[in-house]
C-alpha cells in the first residue's frame, strides 16, 4: 500500500471508523477540514482513484471465485457425475474438466481447439460438456437438439458438437437438425425427443448449476475445485488441470 493510500485510509478512518461518541467530538469545521484534505489529495493525485478501483475489482473477483469454489463443493456430484451430461476423454480420468458452452458463442468456437488438444495430449483427463444456452432462443433450440443427440447416440455427440459449433451462421434448430442428419442420426426420433422431459430437465439442470456457480457467460469451466471464466487458451487450462492433480 502506498503512502498516499495510507494517508487517505487514515483520514477515512477518522471520519467513519470512530465510535458515535468520538465522531461527535469533531466540530463542523474540523469535519470540513478533514474532507478538504481528502479532496485535495484526490485532486492532486487522481491516479489513487484508479488504484483503488483496481484493488476493489480484484477483491470482488477473488470473492466471486471463492464463492464459486464453495458452490463447486456443494454441487460436485451434479457438476462432475450427472447421468445427463456428455462425457468425453477418459471416463475414469483423475481430473474432470467441465465446460459450459453456447453454440452461438464465438469464444466457444475459439476454445474448441483447446479442449480437443487437452484430450489429445492428456489421456488421463475426463471431459464433461454442459449446454448453457445464454445467447437467445436460437441457442436454446440448438442446445435442445444437442441433448436429443446425446440421448440417441452419445458416440456421435462429439462429431455433431464440432460440426455445429464450427459451422457458419446462426446455430438454431434447423441447422442443428441438418448437422444431426449429416452425422447419421435419426432426425424423426430427435423431433420426438425434443418434447421429452429428459431434454427439459437436462437444460434446467445445467442452467441451475451455472446460476449456483455464478456463471453468466461462455465458455466457463470447472476444473477440479477451480472455476475459470472465458476462453483463456490451452496453456492456462492445462495448467489448471495439472494443478488439480496436486
Regions found by a protein language model. Name each.
Residues 1-4, 97:
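N-terminal secretory signal peptides that target proteins for export/translocation
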Residues 2, 19-75:
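N-terminal targeting signals for export/organelle localization
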Residues 4-8, 24-39, 178-246:
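C-terminal cap of thioredoxin/glutaredoxin-like
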Residues 8-17:
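Bacterial N-terminal signal peptides
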Residues 77-95, 119:
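A short beta-strand-turn-helix
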Residues 98, 109-181, 186, 211-216, ...:
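Structural alpha/beta surface segment adjacent to cysteine/selenocysteine redox centers
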Residues 101-104, 217:
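Short pre-active-site segment immediately N-terminal to redox-active cysteine/selenocysteine motifs
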Residues 105-109, 221-222:
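The canonical Cys-X-X-Cys-His
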Amino acid at each position: 500500500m502506498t503512502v498516499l493510500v495510507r494517508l487517505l485510509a487514515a483520514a477515512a478512518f477518522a471520519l467513519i471508523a470512530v465510535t458515535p461518541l468520538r465522531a461527535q467530538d469533531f466540530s463542523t469545521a474540523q469535519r470540513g477540514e478533514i474532507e478538504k484534505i481528502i479532496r485535495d489529495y484526490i485532486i492532486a493525485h487522481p491516479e489513487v482513484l484508479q488504484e483503488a478501483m483496481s484493488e476493489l475489482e480484484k477483491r470482488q473477483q477473488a470473492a466471486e471465485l471463492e464463492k464459486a469454489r464453495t458452490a463447486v463443493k456443494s454441487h460436485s456430484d451434479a457438476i462432475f457425475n450427472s447421468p445427463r451430461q456428455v462425457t468425453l476423454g477418459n471416463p475414469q480420468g483423475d481430473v474432470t474438466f467441465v465446460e459450459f458452452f453456447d453454440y452461438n458463442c464465438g469464444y466457444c468456437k475459439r476454445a474448441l481447439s483447446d479442449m480437443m488438444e487437452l484430450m489429445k495430449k492428456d489421456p488421463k483427463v475426463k471431459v464433461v460438456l454442459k449446454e448453457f444456452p445464454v445467447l437467445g432462443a436460437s441457442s436454446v433450440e440448438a442446445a435442445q437438439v444437442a441433448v436429443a443427440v446425446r440421448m440417441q447416440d452419445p458416440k456421435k455427440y462429439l462429431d455433431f458438437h464440432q460440426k455445429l459449433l464450427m459451422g457458419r451462421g446462426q446455430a438454431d434448430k434447423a441447422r442443428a437438425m441438418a448437422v444431426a442428419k449429416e452425422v447419421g442420426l435419426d432426425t424423426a426420433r430427435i423431433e420426438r425427443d425434443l418434447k421429452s422431459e429428459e431434454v427439459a430437465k437436462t437444460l434446467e439442470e445445467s442452467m441451475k448449476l451455472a446460476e449456483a456457480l455464478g456463471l453468466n457467460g461462455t465458455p466457463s469451466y470447472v476444473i477440479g475445485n477451480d472455476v475459470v471464466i472465458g476462453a483463456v487458451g490451452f496453456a492456462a487450462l492445462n495448467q489448471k488441470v495439472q494443478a488439480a492433480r496436486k
